[in-house]
Curated annotation (Swiss-Prot):
InterPro entries: ADOMET_SYNTHASE_CS (IPR022631), S-AdoMet_synt_C (IPR022630), S-AdoMet_synt_central (IPR022629), S-AdoMet_synt_N (IPR022628), S-AdoMet_synthetase (IPR002133), S-AdoMet_synthetase_sfam (IPR022636). Its EC number is 2.5.1.6. Its cofactor is Mn(2+); Mg(2+); Co(2+); K(+). ATP binds at H15, D167, G168, K169, S235, G236, R237, F238, D246, R252, K253, A269, K273, K277. Catalyzes the formation of S-adenosylmethionine from methionine and ATP. The reaction comprises two steps that are both catalyzed by the same enzyme: formation of S-adenosylmethionine (AdoMet) and triphosphate, and subsequent hydrolysis of the triphosphate. Homotetramer. Pathway: Amino-acid biosynthesis; S-adenosyl-L-methionine biosynthesis; S-adenosyl-L-methionine from L-methionine: step 1/1. Keywords: ATP-binding, Cobalt, Cytoplasm, Magnesium, Metal-binding, Nucleotide-binding, One-carbon metabolism, Potassium, Transferase. This is S-adenosylmethionine synthase 3. Belongs to the AdoMet synthase family. The keyword ATP-binding applies. GO terms for molecular function: ATP binding; metal ion binding; methionine adenosyltransferase activity. It comes from Picea sitchensis (Sitka spruce). K(+) binds at E43. The lineage of its organism: Eukaryota, Viridiplantae, Streptophyta, Embryophyta, Tracheophyta.
Length: 394
């Protein structure tokens, strides 16, 4: 039986790039909560003792950017210089301007256009992917790497492993079998965890605690065997972390945000962007399309691409690849997708309810993945029943 290895990684909410993603989306949430028509393009960067938010925002909302920055950092656990950043005493810089009027008139006619007329906020192409290897219809490498990171944060915050600090990375390598284009996980080959820790803990305790409290609850026993390799803090020391260890920037973890290297990626980041930015809304709708195809049993794997021109509502192209796993031809799947999904940005916004902020809705997406999440705020994860005008060919 021929197999191959594939690897996906994840990073914790305390990783400096992910800190920036969460701040950018916390700003988006604050704007949308007060003004659902806010136009937001918010970037964040951070380094030792400093966080800066900058970009273009047009909103009627009254937003205290500094308060959002400090609150987000505090909730993640950056409460002293020892852990990499002090939320209450770091410098917060703000440089926010209004959206360019040239972009505004082209995209939404300065709010005069009907939803179906709203153009894409930018050009680009986005991909959605789904696979039947997990209940989430997501790649297992990505699911496990992401869940390991989330579990690290859980046992840090609940005190199970009090030596943990906010920053950390995880990575999982799985041995797969190709079953006619579908991916079948056989076993976990390697587990890698590098986590920030305090000065007092020993490497032996780190390894023991990670195996007992993080790996064991997350990775199903059937995937582990005597040959599974564990690299647990292989560098030997990870005390300095967060923005003190590395600079952070919004939009630098786009593969972690999506499918862990599976499928494809158009290159656009998500966080800090309102739904007129098709980098985000376009990627959400094609995930729903791909997931709905796999959930309907029409393919075991599915990739959907959509592309846009700035100011133009209709997509330039829609593409489907079932990797040879389709029960019907790809061209029939494509027609089914076109009939059931409206890819115009204004209609995506309505159908997925993307103007609704609050409840930390978009901030939640900014750590531990935008897809495969069981949360009613993740409306793009809802499987859509596919209406067929005529019986599908056998």
């Amino acid at each position: 039986m021929e197999t191959f290895l594939f690897t996906s990684e994840s990073v914790n909410e305390g990783h400096p790039d992910k800190l920036c993603d969460q701040i950018s989306d916390a700003v988006l949430d604050a704007c949308l909560t007060q003004d659902p028509d806010s136009k937001v393009a918010c970037e964040t960067c951070t380094k030792t003792n400093m966080v800066m938010v900058f970009g273009e925002i047009t909103t009627k909302a009254d937003v205290d950017y500094e308060q959002i920055v400090r609150k987000t950092c505090r909730e993640i656990g950056f409460i002293s210089d020892d852990v990499g950043l002090d939320a209450d005493h770091c410098k917060v810089l703000v440089n926010i301007e209004q959206q360019s009027p040239d972009i505004a008139q082209g995209v939404h006619g300065h709010f005069t256009k009907r939803p179906e007329e709203i153009g894409a906020g930018y050009q680009g192409h986005m991909f959605g992917y789904a696979t039947d290897e997990t209940p989430e219809l997501m790649p297992l490498t990505h699911v496990l790497a992401t869940k390991l990171g989330a579990k690290l944060t859980e046992v840090r915050k609940n005190g199970t492993c009090a030596w943990l600090r906010p920053d950390g990375k995880t990575q999982v390598t799985i041995e797969y079998r190709n079953d006619g284009g579908a991916m079948v996980p056989e076993r976990v080959h390697t587990v890698l965890i590098s986590t920030q820790h305090d000065e007092t803990v020993t490497n032996d305790q780190i390894a023991a605690d990670l195996k007992q409290h993080v790996i064991k609850p997350v990775i199903p026993e059937k995937y582990l065997d005597e040959n599974t390799i564990f690299h647990l803090n292989p560098s030997g020391r990870f005390v300095i972390g967060g923005p003190h260890g590395d600079a952070g920037l919004t939009g630098r973890k786009i593969i972690i945000d999506t499918y862990g290297g599976w499928g494809a990626h158009g290159g656009g980041a998500f966080s800090g962007k309102d739904p007129t930015k098709v980098d985000r809304s376009g990627a959400y709708i094609v995930r729903q399309a791909a997931k709905s195809i796999v959930a309907a049993g029409l393919a075991r794997r599915c990739l959907v691409q959509v592309s846009y021109a700035i100011g133009v509502p209709e997509p330039l192209s829609v593409f489907v690849d079932s990797y040879g796993t389709g029960t019907i031809p790809d061209k029939v799947i494509l027609e089914l997708i076109k009939k059931n999904f409206d890819f115009r940005p204004g209609m995506i916004t309505i159908n997925l309810d993307l103007k609704r902020g609050g409840n930390g809705r978009f901030q939640k997406t900014a750590a531990y993945g935008h897809f495969g999440r069981d949360d009613p705020d993740f409306t793009w994860e809802i499987v859509k029943p596919l209406k067929q005008e005529k019986a599908l060919p056998a």
